[in-house]
Amino acid sequence: MPNTTIIKLTAPALTGLTAATAQTESALNGLPTATVAATTSAPLTLDTALATRLTATINNTDYDGLIAEAHQLPATGNADRYQFVLRPWLWWLTLSSNNRVFQNLSAQEIVEKVFKDAGFIDYQFKVKSKPGKREYCLQYNESDFNFVSRLLEQEGIFWFFTHKEGKHTLVLADDNSAFPPITGEKKVKYQAAQSGERETGAVRSAELRLQATSQGFQSSDYNYEQPKAALFAQAGEKKGGMHSPHPGGFSEKAQGDALAAWKVNALKAQAKQLVGESDCAALAAGHWFTLTDHDDKALNIDWLVIAVSHEYDGERYRNRFTAIPKATPYRPQSSTPKPFMHTQTALVVGKSGEEVWTDKLGRVKVQFPWDREGKSDETSSCWLRVATAWSGNGFGAQFIPRIGQEVVVSFIDGDPDKPLITGCVYNGANALPYALPANQTQSGIKTKSEKGFNELRFDDKKDAELLAMQAQKDFQLAVLNDSKTTISHDEIHSVKNDRTRTVEEGNETVTLKKGNRTVNIEKGSDTLEVKDKRSVSVKGDQEYSVGGDETHKVKGDYTLNVDGNLTIKVSGTLTLESGKTLNVKSGAALNASATSDLKLNGTNIASEAKASLTQKAATITHEAKATLTSKASATQTVDGGGMLTIKGGMVKIN
């Protein structure tokens, strides 16, 4: 059969095109491109040609694309010449970039959203695995195409295009079963280049290439919500070289094991390749064919085309291809870099009406200034951890950034999907707590409450150094052992309500080494209750002044010892009352004196003196209602001095 090539151009927006030359390049997970030179018998209007479809059909094999470039070349003879660069619709994503946040979506859902937002629908997902939800995924300063590419690579999803006249479809998959055979006859003969006529649609040269690759993959990661979990995954063999990146990009062990398994396939996919030339126009990236009639029978197997370039020079057509055994599980390499994030700032956001919006881990949400889609509420970001000066199991420092504060956001390993708040900064809306530069010597911590603030403030101004503390409401201090306070000058306590001091067990000592002590109760009472013994020792004078009544009540004995004199002076009546016996004893003389009457009244009254008893008055009367006895054991003398009168109903003298 003669070696003839038929090429046809179909473009709804451009008529009368005749192909002159054509070159195309395509690869798995690569953007295909085609350059077509054409002639027309009449001039074309190129202004509306961009982004319109053009299909190049080479020997019944279609290559469809959108015109990305249109060039008007110098005319030759009666023909106008043009050149068109064709690209797939996916290439248009390289023309747009974005900064946005995706939350709680799988990689497939994110990619579909990007496609939808760009207005493209010609794609098919043939994914067997189920990509997990991503709590937080950031697109930052990268084209939509690069963003989509790296997400697909992270999930081990490869992609290629299928073509027909007027349409090309993006196929996204993660298993070799998604690769279709080439169009037409899937068996392609090996027919080495030779003179004379030859059959078209055959492989003209084929070269087997083997290369060393890593035979194993291992990686680790860290999940702060399960900090003790051993997140380590490994697959393949160490002896052939082990690829060991960190972090691995997984948060669960099962996820890591699955990732390691397909990462090994991605490493091994390039180990064995068939590189050749053919004039089979049906060869296309992502399609497989069966090689036949090769002298090396081991090569007569199914081959998957991973890259191919077609070339038509106006007379002759040929292509160059690279293929791997179809039986080799194919996964893409991770070649699209993640943006490396540097430190940024953001505003803390949360639910409307709240002052603080946080969770059990003290995380907050933020709105980045570049995020045009965020609503500055609790949906603007994922929960971001907040770095503190100290953290531990139930201890450490805790300061939760409030809604409206500007925070400094870093990214662990520069990963846009791993933000971490490392601090807070002031701005034009959030002023410092101590106005500057007037208070440049002041520093401290000042919080904010609905009605005021709590504060710990330091002032290092010379000769005015100060440490000030304020509790907006209650203040609690707990000391589990000793507490010692040393004050080198004055101390002032002012309590506007109650004050209670309790010493549960032990002693209390108050020592005033020099000076006076005054307790002034301006209004109210003073109560002292001692349930055991109380001692008061005053080495100098003590004076009591009571403006009203004073009452002492003693349930036991009452003893008053005075080394000097005791004077009791009462403006009114002095009453001494004993429920039993009243004893008055004097070591020397006992004097009882009254300016009026002095009365002794009792059932029996005895006056006894060891030496003599003298009763002296102007008149002394001894009167008994029954019997009055005057008796002396030895001698009794009754002397009237002047007159002695003894009177009775009967008087006996014996």
Q: Where in this protein do the model-derived segments appear?
A:
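Acidic, low-complexity/disordered segments
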Residues: A285-H287, T292, D296-A346, L420-G428, ...
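Structural signature for extended repeat/solenoid scaffolds and their inter-repeat hinge/linker regions
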Residues: F161, L172, F289, T343-K616, ...
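Glycine-rich, acidic and aromatic/proline-enriched surface loops and short helix-turn segments
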Residues: R87-W89, N104-F125, P247-A258, K351-T379, ...
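Short, well-ordered loop/turn sites that connect or cap secondary structure elements
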Residues: D47-L50, L283, S376, P401
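Short, solvent-exposed secondary-structure boundary/capping segments
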Residues: Q72-L86, L170, E311-A323, V356-K360, ...
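Extended, domain-scale alpha-helical bundle/helix-rich regions
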Residues: T24, T52, A75-T76, L105-E109, ...
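Short, basic/aromatic beta-hairpin or loop at an interaction surface
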Residues: Q23-V36, K253-Q270, E373-T388
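Assembly/oligomerization scaffold segments
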Residues: M1-R100, Q154, A271
